[in-house]
Amino acid sequence: MSSLAAPQTGLLRQYLVLTKPRVTQLAVFCAVIGMFLAAPGMPDLSHVVFGTLGIWLLAAAAFAINCLIEQEVDARMLRTARRATARGTISDIQVLSLSGLLGGAGMLVLYHLVNPLTMWLTFATFVGYAIIYTVILKPRTPQNIVIGGLSGAMPPALGWAAVADSVPAEAWVLVLIIFIWTPPHFWALALYRNNDYIKAGLPMLPVTHGQQFTRLHILLYSFALLATTLLPYAIRMSGALYLASALALGGMFVWYAWRLYREYSDALARRLFRFSILYLALLFGALLIDHWVGLLR
């Protein structure tokens, strides 16, 4: 039994890697925050559970398609060369079947157990990432992250729609925050993985415009991000607790970006990249805590 289970476990692990679980977790986390912010009190737990499940399934399906489309590119990059699609240990049909199963299940869950609006918005996000970003933008323009960032910024709106069956201005403010966060996050990665992107032939900003230009734009975007994160307080969507958190976290982001701009090192770029992930999680966590504190008043 153990000899039979080992290959099956290995295959399941390879499937899991194709769904980019860490990236999926952050996206779903932001969607869940949107769900709780959408309700004046406690949201309908069935919508939270099934909304989370459906969004996770479609996100995983999109990432699997991304790995399938980019398998030749991934094989040339050190960071992604071990993916099953890049090594050819999983066939195209297997990946398509996995994506179809996950995506189909996600759409059914969202349509029948949440609401049609959430399903269509999540499906549009799937198309935006798996097709428009991966196929059209990423291999053709250094602004791929800027233009294609909208699909990655959508989770709060998807979560909001799951609970409220609408997407008001407050939800789009959250989308805007992630949209502005995305370029400096990925450009930091592209800086210290520059050789990978050169080998892959992808026109990331450091490849096409150089390191100094990219570092300047990371710094400029960090200031824009700090300003954008003040919007929830400005429109009275959040209170002083969130404001203090946004200023502190934004100040740290600017500080990292300033250091990177003044004196580059791969270690600093890697540190900024990792901090940016923590930054987004803490910022959205602060939004939720501030929301709950407001409900208790």
Curated annotation (Swiss-Prot):
Pathway listed: Porphyrin-containing compound metabolism; heme O biosynthesis; heme O from protoheme: step 1/1
Location(s) in or outside the cell: Cell inner membrane
InterPro entries: Protohaem_IX_farnesylTrfase, UbiA_prenyltransferase, UbiA_sf
The protein's Enzyme Commission number: 2.5.1.141
Function comment: Converts heme B (protoheme IX) to heme O by substitution of the vinyl group on carbon 2 of heme B porphyrin ring with a hydroxyethyl farnesyl side group.
Note from the entry: Carbon 2 of the heme B porphyrin ring is defined according to the Fischer nomenclature.
Name of the protein in question: Protoheme IX farnesyltransferase
